[in-house]
Amino acid sequence: MLKQLTEKAIPAFETSFPGCQGLFAFDNAKNHQKYASDTLQSGNLNLTPGGKNTLPMRDGWFKKAGNPVTIHTQCMILHDGHVKGLKIVLEERGLWPTNRKLLTQCTIPGDTPGQRKPNPACKYGSNTDCCAHALLSSQLDFQAQKGELQETLEAAGHMVIFYPSFHYE
């Protein structure tokens, strides 16, 4: 989809309407909301730096209280090339608690003894400081992530809208 957009749809629009800004409309299919591989997603971070399943991330940003309020850019990669861990990212933002333990991700008892499963309250963000993933996911830069389709169109100077989800019953 992205390849068709960048190689065919955008060039065709710009050739047909030079100097104009396009408004591209898409349904709300899951593949239209796909994130870029370097997007800020707390689920892509381990508690400690690096790890097998981590992907390089773009820089984040956060506001620091003060007079005036300042915005700081935060590199998500350490000098040795490893992706920072949740603890380091939260410490740099002044969000890592000093008086209590913070779990990587909340879990609740599963269906069988000894089994654990993700806590739905955590997954849907109703408790933003219950674990490191929820706390970081609630930050403005992580909340502001857009899908790759939207980022591509906006970078090309165009606009995009997504139709509301509709499920006929």
Q: Could you tell me what each predicted segment is?
A:
Residues 1-169:
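Short functional hotspots at interaction and active-site rims
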